[in-house]
Amino acid sequence: MRHRKSGRHLNRTSSHRHAMFKNMCVSLVEHEVIKTTLPKAKELRRHIEPLITLAKQDSVANRRLAFNRTRSKEAVGKLFNELGPRYVERPGGYVRILKCGFRAGDNAPMAYVELVDRPVVEEAAEE
């Protein structure tokens, strides 16, 4: 029985799942918006929100915890230098999931995962 076992398996082994969400967390921190399937997006939220909460208090111990979860120095640097200070006043809910239709090949529901309150980049195409 699978009583009280939370989280989606996503038809992957445990190690594959952990590696995938580690990579997705690093990509989201780096780009601040990514496109993925809806179930992966919903599960990613459970991984990235605690990381950002950790980054709100800058300490060596928290940086080491974040590095152990991401294995990326660049991601940890951005988490603690940019994202942590950005979300100090926000008590959670750092991620927005926007549905964006279905994938052409297999009709899988797709979604954008983005960090809320991210700076808007003015496009050069408007000129």
UniProtKB/Swiss-Prot annotation:
Alphabetically ordered keywords of this record: Ribonucleoprotein, Ribosomal protein
One Pfam family cited in the UniProt record for this chain: Ribosomal_L17
One Gene Ontology MF term: structural constituent of ribosome
One GO cellular component, as annotated: cytosolic large ribosomal subunit
Keyword Cell inner membrane: no
Gene3D superfamilies in UniProt: Ribosomal protein L17
GO BP terms: translation
Secreted listed as a keyword: no
PROSITE patterns assigned: RIBOSOMAL_L17 (PS01167)
InterPro entries for the chain: Ribosomal_bL17, Ribosomal_bL17_CS, Ribosomal_bL17_sf
Record note on quaternary structure: Part of the 50S ribosomal subunit. Contacts protein L32.
Similarity comment: Belongs to the bacterial ribosomal protein bL17 family.
PANTHER family xrefs: LARGE RIBOSOMAL SUBUNIT PROTEIN BL17M (PTHR14413:SF16), RIBOSOMAL PROTEIN L17 (PTHR14413)
Name recorded for this polypeptide: Large ribosomal subunit protein bL17
Organism: Chromohalobacter salexigens (strain ATCC BAA-138 / DSM 3043 / CIP 106854 / NCIMB 13768 / 1H11)
Gene that encodes the chain: rplQ
